[in-house]
């Protein structure tokens, strides 16, 4: 059973600006270290970061809470499996609320094109 669906789109140029300005404090507030390590070396680092941020926004929309209830951006991280498929890695309050909602899995899709990154999250019960 589907518990929630969230979608978000962001402008990649925002994240290019963060990288150009070397705004490490902001990047640390928005992204887990593993996310930064994955995206920074890539040719399209801004697209990579933008898609991950869109995933975080889509997750809190699917959860139905927004960023209330003490969720931090870094508690919602995006990883990739061996084939490159993205997945959510939740911790802290984000994981707690996910469990309290009765969710068993989160499905994630990312894309970027034409200056925008988009993410969709579907939360599913067992």
Curated annotation (Swiss-Prot):
Catalytic activity: apo-[ACP] + CoA = holo-[ACP] + adenosine 3',5'-bisphosphate + H(+)
General function of this protein: Transfers the 4'-phosphopantetheine moiety from coenzyme A to a Ser of acyl-carrier-protein.
Alphabetized SUPFAM superfamilies for the sequence: 4'-phosphopantetheinyl transferase
Top EC group: transferase
EC code(s) of this entry: 2.7.8.7
Signal peptide range in chain numbering: none
GO cellular component: cytoplasm
Major localization listed first in the record, in broad terms: cytoplasm
Any GO BP annotation: fatty acid biosynthetic process
Subcellular location: Cytoplasm
Keyword field: Cytoplasm, Fatty acid biosynthesis, Fatty acid metabolism, Lipid biosynthesis, Lipid metabolism, Magnesium, Metal-binding, Transferase
Name this protein carries in UniProt: Holo-[acyl-carrier-protein] synthase
Family in the record: Belongs to the P-Pant transferase superfamily. AcpS family.
GO molecular function: holo-[acyl-carrier-protein] synthase activity; magnesium ion binding
InterPro entries assigned: 4-PPantetheinyl_Trfase_dom, 4-PPantetheinyl_Trfase_dom_sf, ACPS, Ppantetheine-prot_Trfase_dom
UniProt-annotated binding residues for Mg(2+): 8, 57
Taxonomic lineage: Bacteria, Pseudomonadati, Thermodesulfobacteriota, Desulfuromonadia, Geobacterales
Required cofactor(s): Mg(2+)
Superkingdom, natural source: Bacteria
């Amino acid at each position: 059973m589907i518990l929630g669906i969230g979608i978000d789109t962001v402008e990649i140029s925002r994240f290019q600006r963060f990288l150009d300005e070397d705004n490490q404090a902001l990047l640390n507030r928005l992204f887990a270290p593993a996310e930064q390590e994955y995206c920074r070396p890539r040719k399209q680092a801004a697209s990579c970061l933008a898609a991950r941020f869109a995933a975080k926004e889509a997750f809190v929309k699917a959860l139905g809470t927004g960023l209330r209830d003490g969720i931090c951006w870094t508690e919602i991280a995006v990883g990739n499996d061996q084939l490159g498929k993205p997945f959510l890695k939740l911790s802290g309050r984000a994981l707690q609320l996910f469990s309290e909602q009765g969710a068993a899995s989160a499905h994630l899709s990312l894309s970027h094109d034409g200056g925008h990154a988009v993410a969709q999250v579907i939360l599913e019960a067992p």
